[in-house]
Amino acid sequence: ADSVMFCTSKGLGAPMGSLLCGSKDFIRKAAETRKMLGGNLRQAGFMAAAAEYALRHNIPALAEDHRRARELCGMLQDAQAISIPSVIQSNIIILDITGTRLSPSEFIARLKVRGLWLSESGSSHVRMLLYSGISDEEVRQAACILKEFLSEL
């Protein structure tokens, strides 16, 4: 690929913003297109400063999020009725819940009342996302909540 775009507000924790990287010609064309579509933004320096801070200071925290995701998967390896990915490369875990015979929305609703929030990721999958606001203890609690719920099915 000759270009890449990434969001600074997700794992890096900036309040908003994305970076588009590529050749000077590509960036010039992208800026023109953005302006034509009404996406021009004035006084954006404060957002750029927050994104720059996140790039300079928050990258090490991503490794912690990834570690917690791997640990959570390890805690769930023996859980019933779900399939856990064998390799976790980020802070996102996609669980196959086909074995529960619940729809993703029902699965999510039942866990939400127990204090565990997930999101849908297709017709038979749910997504768990770990971020810097989640502690090691909360990861252990999430595993316990999920395993207890699955044992009751």
Language model: regions and residue ranges:
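Active-site C-terminal subdomain of aminotransferase-like
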Residues: 1-99
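Short, ordered loop/turn segments at secondary-structure junctions
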Residues: 9-10, 103, 123
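Short, hinge-like loop/turn segments at secondary-structure boundaries
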Residues: 21-23, 103, 137
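Hydrophobic alpha-helical packing residues
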Residues: 72, 76, 111-114, 146
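A short, conserved structural fragment
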Residues: 82, 117-118
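A structural signal for short secondary-structure junctions
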Residues: 85-89, 110, 121-123
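A C-terminal functional module that forms or caps the active site or interfaces directly
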Residues: 94-113, 119
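PLP-dependent enzyme catalytic core of the Aspartate aminotransferase-like
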Residues: 106, 114, 124-153
